[in-house]
Structure formats: structure tokens, C-alpha cells
């Protein structure tokens, strides 16, 4: 069994350290990817969710050539997972969507700041991504600050990468949802300010074979908060 984790805009594979470790210890072949131009992956940033889904499909051919893979995606990664499931049903077995919304509009003030590689884009994203408790710096991991970790990860993205990601999210159309037949789990943070709970519930309503789980008191950065 192969399980592929896909990160969100501006981030990389390191956000999946704990869940990847868990599933690896429970018999899964785990791949936490760095999308092109993120983390350790080279190349230019891809500018649409469809291009990223094509890239993911090629990755599945490489790591699981004879068997469909399950895909877990957070935020932008959830859009990549949905697009891949809709367009490459023969490659994707199941989905888990965290902090999702379809479409996924991005505020102009954030897009413009990211286009200018302005620190303000990181500050806005970092603040809006956390619940009230999370934005105060609290963490379930002793000695860590959610805000500091999130800021550092976004600062590591190369020039133009965060803007390319946000543009891809902003341009994504929800048409793909009606084509998804794979079993899907949607995780919704009740205090998510980036992809509000109502947006996650709209995705649930649009899918055919779906379960949902609500995370009380959790913001968009659910991987660090819970």
C-alpha cells in the first residue's frame, strides 16, 4: 500500500513528519513529496493545479507502478489530490483532504504581497492559518512555536514560488469534484480562517463517497496544532 502526502502552498514535505512516521510504522509505503521548486525538488514552480496533478500522476507511476496509491493533501495539496483523482482515477485509490475548499479563492492583498516577495505575505498567511490559541504561539510539542515554525518554512520558499502556488489555488475550478468517485475523508478545522468550515462542508456535499471529521478548536495549520 502506497500513501502519498502533498503539502500546501509555500511549504514542503517536512510538514508531514509525524503522520508519515505513523503510517510507515503501520505497514504503508509512505512518500511525502516536495512539489517542483519546493524543499529539495528542483525545477520551476508549476503554475496550475492541473500541472501539479500531472506531476503527481507521473510520481505515482514511479513509486507505485502496479498499484493505485492513496493521496493525502493539505490546502493546495488537497486541490492537487482532487485534480489527480478526477483525471487519473486509475492511479488514485483513496483521498484524504485537510483544510480544503473548492474553489480556493485567495485575497488580492495576499496575492499582491506574494507577487512582490513581501514578508507581509508570510505574516498574513501565518496569522490566518492558526486558530486563536495557535496564533498565540501555543504548541502541543514542547519547546516549539507554531508561528515561528510556519514563518521559517514559508521563508525558505524561493522567489516567486509562494506566488505561483497561491495563483494556482486562486485559479482552480471546482468542476473536478463531480468526477471523483474514490472514497474520501475530509478533515475540517472548526477555527480555520483560510478555508473556513463552511467551505470544507461544501466539498463534502459535492463528493459522492465521503466522510468528514471536525477538529474542534483547530485552525488551518492543523498539522502543527493537532
Positions of PLM-derived features:
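Catalytic histidine-centered segment of alpha/beta-hydrolase-like enzymes
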Residues: 218-226
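Short beta-strand/loop motif that positions the catalytic acidic residue
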Residues: 180, 186-188, 192
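Conserved alpha/beta-hydrolase "acid-adjacent" motif
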Residues: 193-199
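Active-site glycine-rich loops that stabilize anionic/oxyanionic intermediates
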Residues: 8-11, 75
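Flexible "cap/lid" loop of the alpha/beta hydrolase fold
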Residues: 79-124
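Short beta-strand element of the alpha/beta-hydrolase
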Residues: 1-8
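Active-site loop/oxyanion-hole signature of alpha/beta-hydrolase fold enzymes
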Residues: 17-25, 29-76
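Conserved alpha/beta-hydrolase catalytic His-Asp/Glu region
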Residues: 112-179
